[in-house]
Amino acid sequence: MSRLNNKKQILIIIILSAVLILLIAALIILTNHGRTQDKADTATQSSAETAVTAVSTESETESATGVPKTTAAETEPATVVDSEAERDAYYSALVTEAQASGRKIVYLTFDDGSGTLTPTVLDTLDKYNVKATFFVVGNYSPSEDFARTEYNDIISRGHTLGIHSFTHSRANIYESFDAFKADADHMYNYVTELTGRPPRFWRFPGGSATSFADSRMKSDYIPYIESLGMTYYDWNVSSGDGSGNITRDKVYQNVINGVTNKDISVVLMHDGSGHDETVAALPSILDTLINEMNCLIVPITASTTPVQSQF
């Protein structure tokens, strides 16, 4: 009986020891989990603080330059509408403030790209922290890959991308409504596919007053462009670079003289093939407009009052 009692006591001790070991193990596990969670919380807090710092830094940069930064989020389809609305509001406020103080407003527009001269134009605009508007022609680019790169570069640098037809062949485009519709649809879909954004701005080849279109411009072509959700823009200052041979000095004089006589100028220039003199004149034009004439140079947005020919 004594031996049996001893065995029972030993068994109880073993069981109690096992339970104690399990309790100690559980305590260790819980302690380690708490430390891991603390580290995770610290990391999360650190990430949040980093994000706040990044946003603050970006805001300070925007304030210093006067130009809203284009963020990666703006390239996402879900935020396109919001970012465009914010951009419109930003430039609308700048224009309102400038007009109240008596400053001239200038919209620089470039037709017939994107070609091999477009990258140089973009770099020059960057040097002067100026945003412009590009009305591009589909088949004037060396290739579709080139067009994709340049169209998206125009957008990512904060400029406005508009369209100027796919072929720019006025004789063919304005031959009939069906021909016009086919070209406009082609370019609209082409730009949407390459950029992920449907275009909102259109410039008629030759302008809306072109003799190729006659009365059909008002009755057919303009209503169709508007049915696509686009606004068309003409110009009220011409650089004269579309007429063939012209020197950089003459391009400069045409632009500066035109802007001098207007409170609001929509300037027509070209960045397509053969317009090297325009590209060469651009730094002098920007220097005079900014440093001598104190003009506000902004891109066309939805809030911009269109300059359009009167019918």
Predicted segments with their positions:
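Residue-level detector of anion-binding/catalytic polar loops
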Residues: K131, T160, T231, C295-L296
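N-terminal, intrinsically disordered, polar/charged segments of Gram-positive cell-envelope systems
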Residues: H33-R103
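A short glycine-rich beta-strand->turn/loop micro-motif centered on a GG-aromatic cluster
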Residues: F134-G138, N294-P306
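Catalytic domains of cell-wall/extracellular-matrix polysaccharide-remodeling enzymes
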Residues: H168-L268, G272-N291, S303, Q308-F311
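Gram-positive cell-envelope targeting signals
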Residues: M1-S59
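Active-site beta->alpha N-cap acidic-glycine motif
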Residues: V80-P198
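Generic alpha-helical hydrophobic packing signal
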Residues: L11-I12, V19, I29, D153-R157, ...
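Helix C-cap/helix->beta junction micro-motif
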Residues: Y128, R157, L228, E292-M293
